[in-house]
Structure formats: structure tokens, C-alpha cells
A protein has these predicted regions:
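Flexible, acidic/Gly-rich N-terminal and inter-domain linker regions that tether
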Residues: 2-164
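The −1 position to Zn-ligating cysteines in a subset of zinc-ribbon hairpins
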Residues: 176, 180
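Conserved Radical SAM active-site core
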Residues: 129, 137-172, 182-224
């Protein structure tokens, strides 16, 4: 269970004692308690109570879905250059629409002052809310790159059911997700269409799609 603390009382991270790696394990893993950053550092959540924050329904309702909502959350913590950069990406380059839960937003620049530079440099922000300047449009794509980079659609044995390995299948039961990662490997199906990507659509009713999955699995007992 995570702990939460006001930002002014959050202790400085302590480095674990240096441990001698054991045989076969060349890395040292630092262990420290998980402390949830103070969400009230965001102007838009300044008055959000702990009870609200820890409520799953509140988290779902308050997901950031567009630039206007992001402005409300961030306030004046970042400047206009960031929003212009994000808008340019959304209009021409983005493969996923924006959907970021508050808890995920709260992992961005967790314990340092929030500035435009810090927000741009944050690795989780880069993954969840990419901006145009993040992308190397001057570099060509790999010649074998495609929208469905894992070729899962090519291997559908029923709508939404990929059978690539002898004993395993991948069932895509929904075309939505609790959050949309900016560089999702299943962006060809998941989420809303964007100016850059006209997404595939599941056409069968869910009950018919699931029945087709079950029928296939019954006919292939080698799938575990």
C-alpha cells in the first residue's frame, strides 16, 4: 500500500548501502519505501483530499484527456512553449489520443521543482504525453516499420485473437485502455483515431467476438 505525505515533509532519498553483487547478479538494486508524491503541488489538484485521491472513481473521472484539461492541472507551472509543442504533436504526429490518470500524472517530476525544462526532461512525461520536439522527424523510419509493429492483426485467427506461439494466444477484448501511452505498440487498434492514424475498428459485438475466441480455443487444446 502506498503512503502519501505533504510535499514539504517528504524526506530526501537515502541511498542504500553498497552491496557486493552475488554470483550471477551484476546489478545493485536500491530498495526504498514507495512514497506517493504530493499531488497538491499541481494547481488543479491543490484542494483534492486524500479520500478523493485514493478513490478509483475519482481517478477515472479526472483523467487528463486534452490540452485544456492539462492546462487546468498544471496551471502556470509550465510555459506556453510546452503547450504549443504539444498542440503541434497532437495535430500532426500523435498516434494516440491523450488519456492520463491523475496517479500517472503525479509520477512526473515527483520530488523536484516543476518547471518547463523539468517537465520536458521527465521520462514518464515523454512516454505518456509526447510533444513534437521529442520526435526525430529528420530520421527515416525502419524500412520494415509498420503501424502494427508486432503484426498481430496479420495473425488474427478470429477478430481480436492472435495466435503466434504454439501454446499462447493474445486476446484483445477491448479497444480501450485505462491510460493511453504515447508510444503504444498496439496503437493501430487501441484508442481513438488521430490526425496521423485512422485506427482499426472491432466490428463484431463483444458477445460474438468472445464466442469466436472460445470456439477457436476449444478446437486448439494445445493452447494453455
Amino acid at each position: 500500500m502506498t503512503q502519501t505525505q505533504p510535499v514539504e515533509t517528504i524526506p530526501q532519498p537515502r541511498h542504500a548501502p553498497v552491496a557486493v553483487p552475488t554470483a550471477g547478479q551484476p546489478y545493485e538494486y536500491r530498495r526504498r519505501p514507495l512514497v506517493e508524491p504530493d499531488w497538491t503541488r499541481f494547481p488543479g489538484w491543490r484542494h483534492v483530499t486524500r479520500e478523493q485521491w485514493e478513490n478509483a472513481q475519482w481517478q477515472r473521472v479526472n483523467c487528463v484527456k486534452n490540452i485544456k484539461q492539462l492546462r487546468t492541472v498544471l496551471g502556470d507551472l509550465v510555459d506556453e512553449t510546452f503547450y504549443a509543442d504539444l498542440e503541434a504533436d497532437q495535430k500532426a504526429l500523435a498516434t494516440m489520443s491523450m488519456l492520463v490518470p491523475p496517479q500517472m500524472m503525479n509520477t512526473m517530476v515527483p520530488f523536484a521543482p516543476m518547471t518547463t525544462e523539468a517537465f520536458l526532461a521527465d521520462p514518464i512525461r515523454r512516454y505518456m504525453i509526447p510533444v513534437a520536439s521529442d520526435r526525430r522527424t529528420d530520421w527515416p523510419s525502419h524500412p520494415y516499420a509498420s503501424r502494427d509493429s508486432l503484426h498481430e492483426h496479420d495473425m488474427w485467427v478470429a477478430e481480436g485473437l492472435t495466435h503466434r506461439y504454439p501454446t499462447k494466444v493474445l486476446a484483445e477484448l477491448l479497444s480501450t485502455c485505462p491510460q493511453y501511452c504515447g508510444h503504444c505498440t498496439r496503437m493501430d487498434l487501441v484508442g481513438n483515431s488521430t490526425p496521423a492514424v485512422d485506427k482499426l475498428k472491432l466490428t463484431l459485438k463483444p458477445v460474438d467476438r468472445y464466442d469466436a475466441h472460445i470456439t477457436y480455443l476449444k478446437a486448439h487444446p494445445g493452447v494453455r
